[in-house]
Amino acid sequence: MIRFILLQNRQGKTRLAKYYVPLEDSEKHKVEYEVHRLVVNRDPKFTNFVEFRTHKVIYRRYAGLFFSICVDITDNELAYLECIHLFVEILDHFFSNVCELDLVFNFHKVYRYLILDEFILAGELQETSKRQ
């Protein structure tokens, strides 16, 4: 199960956060800080999977943005790595070559048009086709 999805820039600003488990606001900020600290300084030669508390974080960097997904320790890492890539492809299609500014100024479209909820529902991957 997906615990949360974060899109952060290199400076640690969270551009998009979607939590599938209830957390207090203070805990959310702490999680965002810890995840950023884990992924930003990691050597590119290492894998894109890292243990985080009792879960694991799968991340991928696209330009200046880090797309991170926290999942259960037993979940398939490669499936969620492809999930990140699918999300980026959908954003590229929706925004015509997405960049960080698209997410800053059009974040309501990502939520209002339910781009993320079209293929992830209640923390589970539902749809893997970008055509549907």
UniProtKB/Swiss-Prot annotation:
Belongs to the adaptor complexes small subunit family. This is AP-2 complex subunit sigma. The keyword Ion transport does not apply. It comes from Zea mays (Maize). One of its GO terms (cellular component) is AP-2 adaptor complex. It comes from the Eukaryota. PANTHER family: ADAPTOR COMPLEXES SMALL SUBUNIT FAMILY (PTHR11753). SUPFAM superfamilies: SNARE-like.
